[in-house]
Curated annotation (Swiss-Prot):
Record-given protein name: Serine/threonine-protein phosphatase CPPED1
Modified residues (Phosphoserine): S2, S293
Keyword match Manganese: no
Reactions mediated catalytically: O-phospho-L-seryl-[protein] + H2O = L-seryl-[protein] + phosphate; O-phospho-L-threonyl-[protein] + H2O = L-threonyl-[protein] + phosphate
Reported function: Protein phosphatase that dephosphorylates AKT family kinase specifically at 'Ser-473', blocking cell cycle progression and promoting cell apoptosis. May play an inhibitory role in glucose uptake by adipocytes.
Cofactor binding, per record: Binds 2 divalent metal cations.
Species, as recorded: Bos taurus
Cellular component aspect of the GO annotation: cytoplasm
Annotated stretches, region: Catalytic: 47-250
Molecular-function GO terms, alphabetical: metal ion binding; protein serine/threonine phosphatase activity
Length: 313
């Protein structure tokens, strides 16, 4: 499948917004809704991890295809339908310019094209999508393949911000792009800070932190100085939650009144969690979320206590 053919489904993020939702119509709170968060389908990592060669391995991804198909089938069965399905980065394992990247991307797009057309896809860039140290070229490639690397959109009075967390990790090879991203983010947070929205929610690949704001720097979190600066910005703007992936395990914590939610992977697990998805229910007062294994969500659907939240006025 060519990128052009895939464009309709995957290029919904354009001009720093998502064309699936009208910002005019969606500015008003209309009552509770829910969405699905997934992370790290990362086609190719399971083989690379098993062979101990994460840099050069990953020449097979049949397992990940099956898991992604199971995730899509589970989402398509849900009733009522989620407002959207967000994938928080590391869509494929092969880094920019590496072997198998094109094939992994085509296979993932083939699976994602089967998501119910009434459930928009929200695609977040991860380090494997734009590179650990992104460049203008790797960012441009992501945009050609998947749409904008950062953008905002409104759903039912809630402002959602999709960030490119690689700019927060290492922007040494694209400082001008980071500056544009930071300026845009400050503008968006001003809107949130004016309380023009019911809630504000952030999606990014790399977590601010895994358990607590003061934890040591690690491959799987942002550095202390960056995470504190970002977390304070979010708190002051009234952001309720940050949803991320990257860790391939479930984790998270709170800082002041900010919920940092780290979801395990659809694909390769690096801990004891199961391949799964997170159901996120947004009500007038709060955001409630629960991680489901793919088997649980496929077989049983969403539990009654979460469904009851959707009936609140």
């Amino acid at each position: 499948m060519s990128t052009a053919e895939a464009g309709g489904v995957f290029h919904r993020a354009r001009g720093r917004t998502l064309d699936a939702f009208s910002s005019e119509k969606e500015r008003e709170w209309k009552g509770p809704f829910y969405f699905i968060q997934g992370a790290d389908p990362q086609f190719g990592l399971m083989k690379a991890w098993a062979t101990g060669d994460c840099d050069n391995g990953g020449d097979e991804w049949e397992q990940e295809i099956r898991l992604a198909e199971q995730a899509v089938q589970a989402i398509n069965k849900l009733n009522p339908k989620p407002k959207f399905f967000v994938l928080c980065g590391d869509l494929v394992h092969a880094m920019p310019g590496r072997p198998w990247r094109k094939e992994q991307t085509e296979d993932l797009q083939r699976v994602l094209r089967t998501v119910d057309s009434d459930i928009p896809l929200v695609l977040v860039s991860g380090n494997h999508d734009v590179g650990n140290v992104p460049t203008p070229e790797t960012i441009a490639e992501f945009q050609r393949t998947w749409g904008d690397d950062y953008f905002s959109f409104w759903v039912g009075g809630v402002l959602f911000l999709v960030l490119n967390s690689q700019f927060l990790y290492d922007a040494s090879r694209c400082p001008a792009l980071k500056q544009e991203h930071d300026h845009w983010l400050d503008q968006q947070l001003r809107i949130a800070g004016q309380r023009a929205c019911r809630h504000a929610v952030v999606f990014q690949h790399i977590p601010l932190f895994l358990q607590s704001i003061g934890e040591d720097d690690d491959y799987f979190n942002l550095t202390k100085s960056v995470r504190k600066e970002m977390a304070d910005k979010f708190v002051e703007a009234g952001v309720k939650a940050v949803f991320s992936g990257h860790y391939h395990r479930n984790a998270g914590g709170t800082y002041r009144n900010l919920d940092m939610v780290v979801s395990s992977a659809i694909g390769c697990q690096l801990g004891t969690d199961t391949h799964g998805l997170r159901v996120v229910v947004v009500t007038a007062e709060k955001i409630t979320h629960r991680y489901y294994s793919l088997d649980e969500l496929s077989e049983k659907g969403i539990e009654d206590d979460l469904m009851d939240l959707l009936k609140e006025n």
